[in-house]
Amino acid sequence: MNLNATLFAQMVVFLVLAWFTMKFVWPPLINALDERSKKIADGLAAAEKGKAELDAAHKRVDQELAQARNDGQQRIADAEKRAQAVAEEIKANAQAEAARIVAQAKAEAEQQIVKARETLRGEVAALAVKGAEQILKREVDQTAHAQLLNQLKAEL
């Protein structure tokens, strides 16, 4: 093996270059790689956290939508019950009003019947008195009596 001075010089230069690289070049590269891996890890952690928050938000939204649907259905059911109650109340009021109007009409009809009967009694009494007067004024024979009765029938 032939060793010459160039080989030793190259070895010394290589060792100086290796030492220089280890001392001045390698630490900034390692720091840059560490920072980059830390940023990537932080980004992944933030992405996981964001995904978890998004899932939680979706769950909250789904729960709130379900609650809103339930509330809406409950309000609709309550409104239907109130509408039915109001309709029943209106129906009951209308029936009561109709019964009152019918009773009032019956009372008025009864009053008119009573009034008509009283008027008829008065007229019949007046006609009877008038007929009796006419009978007493005339001579009482069979034909005159029949004519007076027919005339009274016609007036009635």
Curated annotation (Swiss-Prot):
Chief location: membrane
UniProt GO cellular component terms: plasma membrane; proton-transporting ATP synthase complex
Transmembrane segments annotated in the record for this chain: 7-29
Gene Ontology MF terms in the entry: proton-transporting ATP synthase activity, rotational mechanism; proton-transporting ATPase activity, rotational mechanism
Localization of this protein: Cell inner membrane
The keyword Nucleotidyltransferase belongs to this UniProt entry's keyword annotation: no
Alphabetical keyword list: ATP synthesis, Cell inner membrane, Cell membrane, CF(0), Hydrogen ion transport, Ion transport, Membrane, Transmembrane, Transmembrane helix, Transport
Keyword set includes Cell membrane: yes
SUPFAM superfamilies: F1F0 ATP synthase subunit B, membrane domain (SSF81573)
Domain of life according to the entry: Bacteria
Topology class, membrane: Single-pass membrane protein
Role played: F(1)F(0) ATP synthase produces ATP from ADP in the presence of a proton or sodium gradient. F-type ATPases consist of two structural domains, F(1) containing the extramembraneous catalytic core and F(0) containing the membrane proton channel, linked together by a central stalk and a peripheral stalk. During catalysis, ATP synthesis in the catalytic domain of F(1) is coupled via a rotary mechanism of the central stalk subunits to proton translocation. Component of the F(0) channel, it forms part of the peripheral stalk, linking F(1) to F(0).
Family that this chain belongs to: Belongs to the ATPase B chain family.
Record note on quaternary structure: F-type ATPases have 2 components, F(1) - the catalytic core - and F(0) - the membrane proton channel. F(1) has five subunits: alpha(3), beta(3), gamma(1), delta(1), epsilon(1). F(0) has three main subunits: a(1), b(2) and c(10-14). The alpha and beta chains form an alternating ring which encloses part of the gamma chain. F(1) is attached to F(0) by a central stalk formed by the gamma and epsilon chains, while a peripheral stalk is formed by the delta and b chains.
Listed name of the protein: ATP synthase subunit b
Source species of the chain: Burkholderia vietnamiensis (strain G4 / LMG 22486) (Burkholderia cepacia (strain R1808))
